[in-house]
Regions:
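Short acidic (Asp/Glu) and glycine-rich catalytic loops that position anionic groups and cofactors
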Residues: 66, 104-112, 143-144, 241-245, ...
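Short, charge-rich amphipathic segments
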Residues: 55-66, 90-105, 192-205, 294-299, ...
């Protein structure tokens, strides 16, 4: 299953007091109208996640005056839109070598940074706020870009070439932080009395996670309840045969884990073909009966994740883990033997032809 991880039909859309009073246009980013005309208009964007921080500078660049209204601040990091090292390597090295070196650089640096946020949160926080202050000034950062939590307790926002900062410094974007008291005919009133007016309100209020794209599965006529299962290597489910699910990293590039999952599935299918096996089922062993359990995702307090955690499989020990650690996953997923005493295989005819392993994951 590679169906994504959030609902395309039902975004997270809380109701606000007084919404019916508002006389302007209201829209959610998941249902963006193609003919939306906002040039020269005042726009209110409610939210402080990646969606809001992408929308705000984009709309200002096309002539809108935008106010981003956030309940609480988010860590924001400016990164170059283009990787100069990668571009230089491509000029002088074969494409395959340049790609491999760039990938190794990026995975190493992102892994190091995440581990630093866990081991030295105060130091990392000071570094991040220092970079933001260099772009916006101390007063702005203290008021609107200093989260109450530590880095990577929730996802951070990367902005290309500081585009959000540029919009703020140019005066085409503003930030208001606090709780919304009510909507009015012209916009919003905050609990501290601040009034925000706009012709359009964009509710960038988040996504709704789904498990297996919300599809109902059954096994021999019995409905499958995924919270009753344990995750196997972050991709399969205890007691459920021949089913794998792609779920990436929340603390690194999503596709790193998607690559590993695809490679493992190909390895597994080729192993089953070579051994005339048609069924592979992750199966709890007697020694797994009393292992401690944890949520599908640990040490991550983002609301969109915590709201839906009860729908996901549990974690345990050994292979029953969703590590969210690329270095560990490479060992567990790429190098560990297929026959590990946990996967139980069954025989049958009608074996599918062997599949080639993805070449993309052969580096790094």
């Amino acid at each position: 299953m590679c169906g994504g991880y959030y609902s395309y039909n039902e975004p997270h859309r809380p109701e606000f007091p007084g919404e019916s009073r508002y006389q302007g246009q209201v829209l959610h980013p998941q249902f963006w109208p193609e003919d939306l005309d906002y040039e020269g208009k005042k726009v209110i964007v409610i939210g402080s996640g990646a969606t809001a921080m992408t929308i705000v500078p984009s709309m200002t660049q096309k002539g809108a005056q935008v106010t981003m209204v956030q309940r609480s601040p988010t860590y924001v990091v400016s990164r170059p839109a283009e990787d100069k090292i990668a571009n230089t390597l491509r000029k002088w090295l074969p494409e395959k070598w340049a790609y491999a070196i760039t990938r190794l650089k990026n995975t190493t640096l992102s892994g190091y940074f995440y581990r630093q946020t866990r081991s030295q949160p105060a130091k990392t926080k000071a570094q991040l706020l220092g970079m933001a202050t260099a772009n916006l000034g101390e007063e702005m950062v203290k008021a609107h870009f200093t989260p109450s939590y530590n880095p990577w307790d929730q996802r951070m926002c990367l902005i290309p070439d500081g585009d959000l900062y540029q919009s703020i410094n140019e005066g085409s974007a503003q930030v208001v932080t606090g709780d919304i008291e009510t909507w009015t005919e012209q916009g919003l009133v905050m609990k501290d009395g601040t009034e925000v007016t706009g012709d359009i309100i964009v509710t960038a209020t988040g996504i709704t996670l789904t498990v297996m794209s919300g599809i109902a599965f059954d096994l021999d006529g019995t409905a499958i309840n995924f919270p009753d299962t344990f995750t196997y290597k972050g991709m399969m489910y205890s007691g459920i045969p021949n089913m794998a699910h792609t779920f990436g990293y929340i603390n690194a590039s999503w596709t790193l884990r998607a690559d590993l999952t695809a490679e493992y599935v190909c390895r597994l299918l080729n192993h089953m073909t070579a051994n005339q096996q048609a069924v592979a089922t992750p199966t709890l062993r007697p020694e797994d009966a009393n292992m401690p359990t944890e949520d599908w995702i640990q040490d991550f307090s983002a609301g969109y994740m915590r709201r839906m955690m009860h729908l996901f499989p549990k974690q345990g020990q050994g292979p029953w883990r969703n590590t969210q650690d690329y270095k560990l996953d490479k060992k567990m997923i790429r190098r560990a033997p297929i026959e590990d005493g946990v996967l139980v295989f069954g025989d049958s005819g009608n074996i599918a032809p062997a599949m080639d392993s993805p070449t993309l994951t052969k580096v790094a």
